[in-house]
Amino acid sequence: SHSYDSIRDNFNEAYFIAWKNGQTGYPLIDACMRCLKATGYINFRMRAMLVSFASYDLWLDWRKTSKYLATQFTDYEPGIHYSQFQMQSGVTGINSIRIYNPVKQQKDHDGEGIFVREWVPELKEVPLEYIFTPHLMSEGFQEIYNCKIGTDYPEPIVDHGLQVKKAKQILYGICLLYTSPSPR
């Protein structure tokens, strides 16, 4: 829908670069991006999560992020790729908004941190209690586990809860604007 065309006009290049390079401070996002860059493949749920994160947490325009991922997927199929991107980024106006929480996804799909530790070696010594949110480690633990947050591995570049709240307000506002009955 054209109603959504200009909602993400202020493209944040720094967020885009961090997302592309697996440097967001969200371990599963970073592991997926690094795995994709190295192998050309990640499963459907992880693809959906990457799009959700780029679209809602980073508020990046789906047209730019979709072009980048199209160059990374070895199984790229335009007819599937672009329609999925539009749906996952909430710009169709007909699908419900699907926002994936990267910490919850990691707990559900990499509960032991095996995938994350493989693709984000900076976190290989981080214990399970912090593998989902390494930025919550104390400075002492960061030293013990050889992972200084902000130096070896980034702080989360955005606050997931805050960004999702903003995204929902904007997107639901557009939906209400175009679905509310007109005054008589």
Mark where each language-model region is.
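Short acidic alpha-helical/loop segments enriched in Asp/Glu that coordinate divalent cations
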Residues: 1-2, 47, 61-68, 79-84
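Conserved small/polar residues in nucleotide/adenosyl-binding loops
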Residues: 178-184
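Generic, well-ordered alpha-helical scaffold segments in large soluble proteins
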Residues: 31-35, 49-57, 68, 72, ...
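Short, flexible active-site recognition loops that position polar ligands and cofactors
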Residues: 150-161
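Catalytic core of tubulin tyrosine ligase-like
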Residues: 167
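Short acidic (Asp/Glu) and glycine-rich catalytic loops that position anionic groups and cofactors
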Residues: 7-13, 46-49, 93-100, 143-149
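C-terminal, helix-dominated tail/subdomain
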Residues: 57, 68-146
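Gly/Thr-rich phosphate-binding loop signature of adenosyl cofactor/nucleotide-binding cores
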Residues: 1-48, 57-60, 88
